[in-house]
């Protein structure tokens, strides 16, 4: 992975930079990946340039809270949306998170701290559901052990498509793009959708859900 990262940086170094285009970590990458990227770019330019990437380790100029920032931002936006539509954020509010990872985990933890009930989460293997709420601490430890959610005990396995169609209040697609489309948007029952991934709703889905009054 290090060799691949450094070669990739070498090949694109002329089109990135602090004042042009700044790479950031995403699926399959982490702070170490970004450190390799920054180091390679700096070697090519002849001096240290921390600003070429975000998501670096703190030791080489990274920012405190960067890893959780997107997920916390999603939770903040959910609270704002709930206030706008008059939804009281308490245990009766149910949440499903499609993508229990770098964005989904901090979003889930923050929203649970706000008092809502996270009833479903998912990863690439599928989803899990518990109408009384997922044990998030247990779930975090489970995925940190590099295990699939579908194998976690004490919950009901569901598919990712079933998660999207749950009768819930808040849906957070926080995995990949193109998750909610013209083919499945009619199945979505959530009152609020907070996009934690890049483009998880297609244009058709956004238009159709807006007409239904989804915030």
Regions found by a protein language model. Give the residues of each.
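Structural motif
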Residues: 96, 170-172, 194
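Short acidic (Asp/Glu) and glycine-rich catalytic loops that position anionic groups and cofactors
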Residues: 14-18, 54, 122, 189, ...
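Conserved acidic residues
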Residues: 119, 169, 191
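Flexible loop/turn segments at secondary-structure boundaries
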Residues: 30-31, 103-105, 126-130, 178-181, ...
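Glycine/serine-rich phosphate-binding loop and adjoining beta1-alpha1 elements at the start
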Residues: 1-91
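Flexible, charged surface loops at secondary-structure boundaries
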Residues: 163-167, 186-188
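Glycine-rich phosphate/diphosphate-binding loop of Rossmann-like nucleotide-binding domains
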Residues: 65-165
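Rossmann-fold NAD(P)-binding glycine/threonine-rich loop
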Residues: 175-215
């Amino acid at each position: 992975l290090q060799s691949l990262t450094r070669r990739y940086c070498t090949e694109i170094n002329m089109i990135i930079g602090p004042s042009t285009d700044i790479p950031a970590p995403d699926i399959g990458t982490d702070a170490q990946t970004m450190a390799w990227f920054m180091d390679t770019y700096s070697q090519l330019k002849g001096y240290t340039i921390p600003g070429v990437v975000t998501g670096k380790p703190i030791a080489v100029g990274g920012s405190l809270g960067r890893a959780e920032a997107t997920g916390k931002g999603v939770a903040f936006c959910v609270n704002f949306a709930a206030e706008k539509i008059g939804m009281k954020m308490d245990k009766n509010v149910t949440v499903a998170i499609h993508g229990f990872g770098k964005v989904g985990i901090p979003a889930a933890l923050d929203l649970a701290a706000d008092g809502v009930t996270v009833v479903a989460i998912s990863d690439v293997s599928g989803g899990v559901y518990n109408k009384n709420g997922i044990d998030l601490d247990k779930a975090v430890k489970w995925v940190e052990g590099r295990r699939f959610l579908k194998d976690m005990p004490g919950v009901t396995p569901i598919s990712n498509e079933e998660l999207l169609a749950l009768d819930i209040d808040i849906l957070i697609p926080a995995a990949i793009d193109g998750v909610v489309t013209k083919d499945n948007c009619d199945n979505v029952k959530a009152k609020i959708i907070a996009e934690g991934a890049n483009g998880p709703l297609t244009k058709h889905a956004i238009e159709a859900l807006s007409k239904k009054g989804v915030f």
